[in-house]
Amino acid sequence: NNIGAKHAIGNYILILNPDIILTQGAIDKLYNYAIKHPSCGIVAPKLQNRDCSLQYSARRFPSIKILLNRALTKGNDKSGNKNVQTYLLKNLPMDTPTEVDWCMGAAFLISHTFYNELKGFDEKFFLYVEDMDICYRCWKKNKKVVYYPLSKMTHVHQRSSQRLNKKTLIHLKSFFYFFRKNRFKIKSEAQHLTSAPQREKETFQLQPKVVPSK
């Protein structure tokens, strides 16, 4: 991504994985939203599976506890674990534009100037978590990360970390690098998540911060 960005000449950079299938107008909707809302640093579409079911691509920043829960559930998004459900924002209505901590890097739009200001993706991440990291740095620059479900894309996502294999270990290594890089002081940045209760029994009391839809 960083190599491609160096050769980009437009005002905005679209990060797009090769396994993304675009729907009509999806890119235009992201672009139109971005230019109308300069406080938004990163805007990401709704990602769905081939069967049109939702992919939980918008998430909150994890804690070590959530990371361990994800490892124990083998990254299963259908896990009933309350911490995992909170991490995946399953308790929030995700049918309107919403400020979120971070979105999967399979698809998102960012201004060229801001991308350069962030110095792009951290190349010390060999695989995984670099999308979480750039969103975290976006918030630290006082820019928002917005999940924009009016733009829809299909992500032919093949989860490769369902079993404890080499890729799973790389994923875990990237998570721990992210925590170590930020001195293990990770907290939610989106306004509706910042004041969210931390105790497990209260994890479903988050309130969404809905943002303008146009």
Where are these regions (language model features)?
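Conserved donor NDP-sugar-binding/catalytic core segment of glycosyltransferases
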Residues: 21-57
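Acidic metal-phosphate-binding loop of nucleotide-sugar-dependent transferases
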Residues: 20-21, 125
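A short, conserved alpha-helix in the catalytic core of glycosyltransferases
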Residues: 93-95, 101-152
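Short aromatic/hydrophobic "clamp" motif used to bind/position activated sugar donors
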Residues: 13
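Active-site-adjacent helix/loop segment of glycosyltransferases
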Residues: 132-210, 214
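Catalytic metal- and UDP-sugar-binding loop of GT-A-like glycosyltransferases, i.e.
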Residues: 16-18
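Glycine-rich, basic loop-to-helix element that forms the pyrophosphate-binding segment
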Residues: 1-8
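Short, flexible, basic/aromatic active-site loop/helix in glycosyltransferases
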Residues: 62-100
